[in-house]
From Swiss-Prot:
GO terms for cellular component: cytosol. GO terms for molecular function: aspartate kinase activity; ATP binding. Belongs to the aspartokinase family. Residues 323-392, 409-473 form the ACT domain. It comes from the Archaea. This is Probable aspartokinase.
Amino acid sequence: MTTVMKFGGTSVGSGERIRHVAKIVTKRKKEDDDVVVVVSAMSEVTNALVEISQQALDVRDIAKVGDFIKFIREKHYKAIEEAIKSEEIKEEVKKIIDSRIEELEKVLIGVAYLGELTPKSRDYILSFGERLSSPILSGAIRDLGEKSIALEGGEAGIITDNNFGSARVKRLEVKERLLPLLKEGIIPVVTGFIGTTEEGYITTLGRGGSDYSAALIGYGLDADIIEIWTDVSGVYTTDPRLVPTARRIPKLSYIEAMELAYFGAKVLHPRTIEPAMEKGIPILVKNTFEPESEGTLITNDMEMSDSIVKAISTIKNVALINIFGAGMVGVSGTAARIFKALGEEEVNVILISQGSSETNISLVVSEEDVDKALKALKREFGDFGKKSFLNNNLIRDVSVDKDVCVISVVGAGMRGAKGIAGKIFTAVSESGANIKMIAQGSSEVNISFVIDEKDLLNCVRKLHEKFIEKTNS
């Protein structure tokens, strides 16, 4: 049996936690034939790397770089002391850490002197989080008596294009690179989040990259299971911080999990699911700090529970853009032009809805992308502030609603269920919220809508009470 185990930043947030993870891994190795580990950077390290790289560019202060290097060395040295008992293994790992930190310092000083931070350089800097945590975890596994080696994503066979910052996989050489190690009983500890180009340059895989790395390795190895170890005991019916009665969901289908992940569930990134789904590899979400908890199993089965609705997820810090114009009626390609313009400004559209009259299109984007979105629309369609029809503009007006949120109701039981949308919207009304936009995908396992963010708590609690608590009580 081949198992891929991915551990997130909180799971390896300290030396004690790294040793705890190493114990989980070695226990699994004794139970299974082959184990591959994918690891994130220690918690807060990636954010610190983002910050120092920007400071090196903007402030160009070498002293700040020196302070950061001292901080990062102390953090990882402390982790080594806590995670590893053998003095020999400690010294081996410290040599690797010293070499990489020296490399990082040179790059940051180069950014400060040149006043230049290219996407390629930024990816290289951000890669150090995982490149520093992986040797420590590998050392802790060796300290517990198992053979292990730390590998970078490229060394493990993740080959990408040159789209630095959000690289796409060109091909996988995972089987060729990892199978010989597994046959020798070695546990590879692979850096999540990063790959390499054909030319050998380090790339990052974008947000959620470590989960995605685990899925790619599972896909490449035809693994029996992919385990995502995090700081919660699986996927919940909603955010427990909003609804204290939220409960763990034992099983989800790939489609349900993808919808939940896309619409705000932080446990899993939606890109993780597709490689596993293509080969039918189960994904198990587990809690590092409660390893005996069963977690949530994600498979191809559309298991119908007693609840039509399985979960409710939310996205905050978004804005609703409403585009109006009778000139859009019957004009082919208008929507394509809108999305092309937004794509050129790298604006991600979270949700879309178009009225049957074709006179308006509504979009949900991140709040931080609003200005870029408006700039893109003006560049493509001209000044839509001139509201006379004589101007012959396709777009007559654009309005922006901030302080809104997206709520998504997800469940395979919704497929073909009569009257479910009406019941959902009745519950929303009872909560005192007003719906500003509605969207439903063709999968029929998700209904999403936009309301004012101030109404989010009451709305989620009412939906959870009506569709999950009452059904299961």
